[in-house]
Curated annotation (Swiss-Prot):
One Gene Ontology MF term: oxidoreductase activity
UniProt-listed Pfam families: Sacchrp_dh_NADP (PF03435)
EC number(s) given by UniProt: 1.3.1.-
InterPro entries the UniProt entry points to: NAD(P)-bd_dom_sf, Saccharopine_DH-like_oxidrdct, Sacchrp_dh_NADP-bd
Family stated for the protein in its record: Belongs to the saccharopine dehydrogenase family. Enoyl reductase subfamily.
Keyword Endoplasmic reticulum: no
GO terms for cellular component: plasma membrane
Protein name: Trans-acting enoyl reductase
Length: 418
C-alpha cells in the first residue's frame, strides 16, 4: 500500500507529553479534515488528552506504541502517511522509530536538537529511506526551522533576483522571551552532552562544523567557523551598528542543520556559503560586558559538558532538573515572543535580510512548527522537494512551509537591503 492510501495521514506520537499536547492542540484548531491519530504508551492518558482537545479531535483514533517495543513502532509506521514524534531524548528513544519509518516508506518529522542522533540517523537510515521514498525530516521546531527557513528564503530571493549565491550569512536572535526550559529540553541537552563526553568519536563529530554534511570531503575549506563568539553588530551588518552580540546556545546545532540543507541541495546556497548564529545583547554601555559574559558562560558550559558530563551521576541530576513532560505555564507561553534576523551578502555584493518572528514563546511556536510540518508533508505534497532520505526542513519542504506558516501567525519576509 502506498503511503498516500494509508489509514492515517498524520500520527502524533508522544501526544501525552508537554510538546505533544501542545502540538495536538494546534492540530485540533486547524480545520483541515486530515485523518489524524494520537499515539503513545498509555491508552488512558491518550484518551484524557483527546478529551481536552475539543470537538474536532473527538473522533481521532488512539494508537498504542512504545519506543521499547519496536514491533509496535513498525505497525504504527505502516498505518501512517506521516508520523510526528515528540518522544525524546531522541538519542535514547528515537532511532527505532526512524528505522520503522525508513523501512515502511513513511514520512517523519521530529523536534530533535541532538547532533549525534542526527548523525546516527543519517549513517544508519539515509540510504534505506531514500530507497523506500521516506522523508525523515529532522529538527522541525524552534530547533531549527527559523534558522533553516530564513536561509532558504534568502536563497530563493537571491535566485529570483539573479544576484548570485549566498556568501557571508549571519543569523541574529534579536528578541527572545524564554525564561524557563521544559523537562524535555533539559533532558535533550543532558543526553547530548552525556553522549559527547562518553565517546571520543562523538566528541570529535560534534565539534566538526560539517558533522551532518552529505560528503565531508566535498565541503570547501572556509577557515575556522567558531560556534561561539562575541561580535559587534556592525561586523555582521551595517543595520546592527551600535549593537553587541554573543553566543546563542542553539547555534552549534542549528548551523549544522543549515549546512546540511546546503549540501542536500547540491550546495545550492553556494560553495562560499559561510554561516553563523549569535544573539543580540543590546546597545547599552553594558552590552560589551554582557556579550563577553554570556559568550564565556555558554562556551565554557557546553565545552565542559561535552567533555565531562558523563562523570556526573544521572540520578542526582534528575532530582534537581525539571521532569520530562513538564514545561512553562500557559500564561508564560502566551507572553512570549521571538524574532530571528538573518543577514547575507551574495557573491555579487547584494545584501538581503530575512526575518522569522512569532508572537508566542518557543514552546508554543514549536507546536505550530511541528504541526504545520506534518500538515505540509501530508497535504502539500505538490510543494515538497523531490529529495528523500534523512532531510532537513528546508531541503524537504522549504517552499511549502514558507507558504503555510504565515497562516498561523508566523511572520516571514525576505528584503533586499543593497
Amino acid at each position: 500500500m502506498s503511503s498516500a492510501q494509508r489509514e492515517f495521514e498524520i500520527v502524533l506520537y508522544g501526544a501525552t507529553g508537554f510538546s505533544g499536547m501542545l502540538t495536538g492542540q494546534h492540530l485540533a484548531q486547524r480545520d483541515t479534515n486530515a485523518r489524524i491519530a494520537l499515539a503513545g504508551r498509555s491508552p488512558q492518558r491518550l484518551r484524557a488528552v483527546r478529551d481536552k482537545l475539543g470537538p474536532l479531535a473527538s473522533d481521532w483514533p488512539l494508537v498504542v506504541a512504545d519506543a521499547s517495543q519496536p514491533a509496535t513502532l513498525e505497525e504504527m509506521a505502516t498505518r501512517a502517511q506521516v508520523i510526528l514524534t515528540t518522544v525524546g531524548p531522541y538519542t535514547r528513544y528515537g532511532l527505532p522509530l526512524v528505522a520503522a519509518c525508513a523501512k515502511a516508506g513513511t514520512d517523519y518529522a521530529d523536534l530533535t536538537g541532538e547532533l549525534m542522533f542526527c548523525r546516527n540517523s543519517i549513517d544508519l537510515y539515509h540510504k534505506q529511506a531514500a530507497d523506500t521514498g521516506a522523508r525523515i525530516v529532522l529538527a522541525c521546531g524552534f530547533d531549527s526551522i527559523p534558522s533553516d527557513l530564513n536561509v532558504h528564503h534568502l536563497y530563493r530571493r537571491a535566485a529570483e533576483d539573479g544576484t548570485g549565491e549566498l556568501a557571508e550569512t549571519n543569523l541574529v536572535l534579536r528578541s527572545f522571551s524564554q525564561r524557563w526550559a521544559s523537562g524535555g529540553s533539559v533532558a535533550t541537552y543532558s543526553e547530548a552532552m552525556r553522549t559527547a563526553s562518553s565517546d571520543p568519536e562523538a566528541y570529535r563529530l560534534v565539534n566538526d562544523p560539517y558533522t551532518l554534511t552529505t560528503d565531508r570531503s566535498a565541503e570547501p575549506d572556509l577557515g575556522p567557523q567558531p560556534d561561539f563568539s562575541m561580535r559587534r553588530g556592525r561586523d555582521l551588518a551595517p543595520e546592527l551598528a551600535g549593537f553587541w552580540t554573543g553566543a546563542f546556545v542553539q547555534g552549534p546545532f542549528n548551523t549544522r542543520i543549515v549546512r546540511r540543507s546546503n549540501a542536500l541541495q547540491d550546495w545550492a546556497y553556494g560553495k562560499q556559503f559561510r554561516y553563523s548564529e549569535t544573539m543580540s545583547l543590546g546597545r547599552s554601555f553594558a552590552a560589551p560586558i554582557a556579550s563577553a559574559a554570556v559568550t564565556g558562560a555558554i562556551a565554557g558550559g557546553i565545552g565542559l559538558g561535552n567533555k565531562y558530563f558523563s562523570r556526573l551521576p544521572q540520578r542526582a541530576l534528575e532530582r534537581v532538573t525539571p521532569k520530562p513532560g513538564t514545561g512553562p505555564s500557559q500564561k508564560s507561553r502566551e507572553r512570549g515572543h521571538y524574532r530571528c534576523e538573518t543577514y547575507t551578502t551574495t557573491t555579487t555584493g547584494a545584501r538581503y535580510l530575512a526575518t522569522f518572528a512569532h508572537n508566542v514563546d518557543a514552546y508554543a511556536s514549536t507546536a505550530v512548527l511541528l504541526g504545520e510540518s506534518g500538515l505540509a508533508l501530508a497535504l502539500d505534497r505538490d510543494r515538497l522537494s523531490e529529495l528523500r532520505g534523512v532531510l532537513t526542513p528546508a531541503a524537504a519542504m522549504g517552499d511549502a512551509l514558507l507558504a503555510r506558516l504565515p497562516q498561523t501567525g508566523v511572520v516571514v519576509s525576505a528584503t533586499r537591503l543593497h
